[in-house]
Curated annotation (Swiss-Prot):
Family indicated by similarity: Belongs to the universal ribosomal protein uL22 family.
UniProt KW keywords: Ribonucleoprotein, Ribosomal protein, RNA-binding, rRNA-binding
Pfam families hit by this protein: Ribosomal_L22 (PF00237)
Identification of the protein by name: Large ribosomal subunit protein uL22
GO molecular function: rRNA binding; structural constituent of ribosome
Lineage: Bacteria, Bacillati, Cyanobacteriota, Cyanophyceae, Synechococcales
GO biological process assignments: translation
InterPro entries to which the protein is assigned, alphabetical: Ribosomal_uL22, Ribosomal_uL22_bac/chlpt-type, Ribosomal_uL22_bac/org-type, Ribosomal_uL22_CS, Ribosomal_uL22_sf
One term under GO cellular component: cytosolic large ribosomal subunit
PANTHER family listed in its UniProt record: CHLOROPLAST 50S RIBOSOMAL PROTEIN L22-RELATED (PTHR13501), LARGE RIBOSOMAL SUBUNIT PROTEIN UL22M (PTHR13501:SF8)
Transmembrane segments: none
Protein's UniProt keywords contain Cell membrane: no
UniProt function note: This protein binds specifically to 23S rRNA; its binding is stimulated by other ribosomal proteins, e.g. L4, L17, and L20. It is important during the early stages of 50S assembly. It makes multiple contacts with different domains of the 23S rRNA in the assembled 50S subunit and ribosome. The globular domain of the protein is located near the polypeptide exit tunnel on the outside of the subunit, while an extended beta-hairpin is found that lines the wall of the exit tunnel in the center of the 70S ribosome.
């Protein structure tokens, strides 16, 4: 059951951002073409767009360099953010107490594959 179209991915690990905030951006670009996703990431007002844009460009560069694929024919097949390690800090409070602060990290994974001919006909 091997798929004939190669799937190329890129991973950014230990990004100092909550995976919940990154998933909000990834949900918007999943299933879109590379050009559409870049335009969306350029104009969305979220800080998570910058690391996602870097991972997307890396995945497309991997596809272009390693597999010889054309960036115009690529679609985002997978995009997800897994939780990374949590940095634990403490905030001093009144009367000798301390409240925990959890600085979350995430691992961003984006996979691209060539668009199918049937999908290309419906997209045009």
């Amino acid at each position: 059951m091997a798929d004939s179209s190669p799937e190329v991915k890129a991973v950014a690990r230990y990004i100092r951002m909550s995976p919940f905030k990154v998933r909000r951006v990834l949900d918007q670009i999943r299933g879109r073409t590379y050009a559409d996703a870049l335009i969306l990431l350029e104009f969305m007002p979220y800080a998570a767009c910058e690391p996602v844009r870097k991972v997307l460009r890396s995945a497309v560069a991997n596809a272009e360099h390693n597999n010889g694929l054309d960036p115009r024919d690529l679609v985002i097949s997978q995009a997800y953010a897994d939780q990374g390690p949590v940095l634990k800090r403490f905030r001093p409070r009144a009367q000798g107490r301390a409240y925990p602060i959890r600085k979350r990290t995430c691992h961003i994974t984006i996979a691209v594959r060539p668009i199918e001919e049937a999908e290309a006909a419906t997209a045009s």
